[in-house]
Amino acid sequence: MTVLLAAPDSFGLTLDLALAGLTVGSAAALSGIGLVVCHRATGVLNIAQGAQAMAVAYLLRDLVVVRHWPVWPTLACCLLVVAPALGVLLDVLVHRPLQRRGAGPAETMVAGLGVFVLLIGVAVLLWGPAPLAGAPSPFGGAPIRLPGGHTLRPDTVAQLAAILVLGLAVAATTRWTRLGLHLRAVVDDRRLAALTGVDADRVSALGWAFGTFTAGLVGVALAPYLLLDPYGLPLLVMETMAVAVAARLRSIPVAVATGLGLGIAQSELTRLRPSGQLLPLVQAVQSNLFVIALLAAALLAGPGITGGRAPDGGAPLTSRSHRPGGGRGGGRGGGGGGGRSAGAVCLVLLLLPFGFRGNDLRSALLVPALALVLLSVVVVTGYGGQTSLGQAGYAGLGALGTALLMSGRVPGLPALPAVPALLLAVLATAPLGLLTGRPAIRRRGLALALVTFAFGTALSRFVFQQPYATTGLTLDRPALLDGDRAFYLAELLLLGLGLLAVRALHRGRLGRALTAMRDHEAGAVAAGVDVPGLKLLAFVVGAALAALGGGLMGLAGRAFDAASFDPVRGLLWFAAVVVAGADSALGAVLAAALLIGLDAGTVTGVSAVAVGVLAAAIGRLPGGLAALPTARRDPPPDLPPGRLTPTGRRLRATLNRRP
């Protein structure tokens, strides 16, 4: 197989492609600056940056194209007023309560995902899910002529100028101003800085304002080259986190150099034109180079990347983690009456579709399938304490594997019926859980979340969206299950088996070992628990459950749809599980029913808004909805009576003597 070049190697062509790559590279560099500065000031990785960029880009287009506002005043209003105000609002309502409660990186990340999902849901409600064209380009115009006949776009020049100005401004502010001194103090120790008189909340608010400003700048810069898509643009900007991770969330020069370098490399790869079937793969590498970079950067960064001021990992995302002394039954919906009530509600919701017809019944077919996918999140995150954002990828592998086996597209195997194909796809996908389980041995929290997110995104781009996965596949149900009600009954039986398997996993010695690993990994190691083996087991079981659910989703729709397993949907599913209660199996079933029911019964985007609001409010809802019955039943114990110091006793006596 030979690889041909699009044109003879020449310095002129190389320079032209490098100049073209500066457009995307400069946007990635701006994204890196915003992420690094925001992390310096707040200690939090702005994981919602992509959604913030999308929101500002949509608002600018709506005001300029639809309402015919003038471009430059509108641009100034969006970037200098709306975007910073959004950042301050998010700091006050979302992140500040988490900081005051001393939440760990896991809860902080979930709150950021809540903001991400919420903004996407709002965009879908306001502007619809269909992509929109015609985003305004403030710096549009004739290309700038350079010596030698080369050209450079005016907006690229503007972005490079913004990088220079922002970089110098941040460096000058950090080194030579009082604000920079306060910033360094807050970064070193927020509580100690507050005790010395530093307004840590003000520093944090400025950090979030700057982060959303740069996010808006990135969205405005990229929107003219793309169709505005409420799912595509946030994911594209999120992929540029690679430059900040490569800089270890500390070095602005490294982030800028990485962003520009990746942009140029992505452009230079367009010269490759391999012959044969390699062309789609090479094109996928060229268009998704930032995904590869994010995966590589997250793996090379190791466990040192954190998303908050607490040590990496923090408290587990469970309904038990906030309760004094733990308590029993946390993983079963809160135990007692709360667990029985949740079970009754789930049973009613699962039986209701037997009275549905037509489109309502076809929509309900997705509920048991999605519940199995969400159960995989419960096993990995709720029971195992490992933050995995890539379960949608395993669900897609289950659906794609079933379709390939049924279509006779697997070498050496004939076309299989639906049931054997589904079971074989699950068995083949389960060991692939080791691909994310191995990195989990040395990583927790945000470091692991970035690896699993990049892995799921890579599966979506390099596997699900390739031509072989989108053409010529069949997913016909067995004759006995061809009817929607019969197929729904079969799904319920498989869901019941999945719930029994998860319940068995959570009981006995294995369940106690998983709980020990989740609650305190170092203590579990000291007690002789095989922590690496348990992590691998959690990911393998999670991959199998997700693959089973994904295969059922494909059979329910009678087709493989790559969009159903988009990484953004995976983020929504993860946030929904945490909101329902990360260690609650019944909560996963309830979350699946609500996700499907809200979108099918109302307007697309309502479920994302609901999940986003609850996830963003995780600081006020520790443990999720599953913890509410326990929180009401078991209020926190009274604090022991305080004991005054000698100075306090003298002050009390003085105050008591006053008339």
Please give the residue ranges for each predicted region.
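Hydrophobic alpha-helical bundles that form the membrane domains of multi-pass transporters
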Residues: 161, 168-248, 252-255, 262, ...
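C-terminal ends of transmembrane helices
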Residues: 33-42, 88-98, 243-247, 376-381
